[in-house]
Amino acid sequence: MDWVDAKPMKKYIADNLSRPSALESLARAFLEMTRELHEQGISHGDLQHGNILVRPDGSLVLVDYDSLYVLGMDGIPDDIKGLQGYQHPARIHQRYRSAYSDFFSELVIYTSIRTLAKHPGLWNKYSLADTETMLFTEKDIQSGGTSEIFRLIESDRDIRYLGRAIKDALRQPSLDRIVPLQDIVKGQADSVVENLSKQWLSQSYQPSAFQSNIDIFNQLAEIASRW
């Protein structure tokens, strides 16, 4: 394997806790990577901080392909179940590798990045530098969404939808019932735009003479892109 000039994701996060914009950019890069994997029907199978590297330009590199799934690999046993704290309880019962193997891990990782961007103090509070997870522990996952970290996330209006999405995923009996990350984020963005549009209409908002409908649409799209 070629040498890659990149940092492990957790190291990158630790180095950028004082730069929330860098962590938000990391979250967007991760979201885009997962979208591309989904489009190709690919799953890594052991998605966690140690298997994701961040290049100096912010692009991501996946390593350790022992549990990889691509289209046409149906029927191959799912022997590597992934790191605890990243895996859905149903993963242990999955017999074969599948395109759905990463759905829960992706949601956990994205939520962790977004949460640390908003609340960097959690890094020291939970001594995350010394853990084998990024934010959620195995006990957090086993709690079904009732642990302290879930309460903290749901107290933040910008990211509470992610905590609720994890809780909803934990209620699902199998990985194929979990909503893909890009659909969760898009659903939230669409909701934000819809609510803003309703507020503007209810307040009889009138754009200035120099604003076109395209300008307004672009403003809404920019707001949505931040989610």
Question: For the regions a protein language model found, what residue spans apply to each?
Answer:
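Conserved structural core of kinase catalytic domains
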Residues: 1-26, 75
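Helical subdomain adjoining the active site within ATP-dependent kinase catalytic cores
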Residues: 115-227
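Conserved activation segment of eukaryotic-like protein kinases, specifically the C-terminal portion
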Residues: 76-91
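Conserved hydrophobic scaffold of the eukaryotic protein kinase-like catalytic domain
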Residues: 109-113
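Conserved end of the kinase activation segment
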Residues: 90-100
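Catalytic-loop of the protein kinase fold
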Residues: 34, 38-55
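Activation of the activation-loop gatekeeper triad in protein kinase-fold domains
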Residues: 64-69
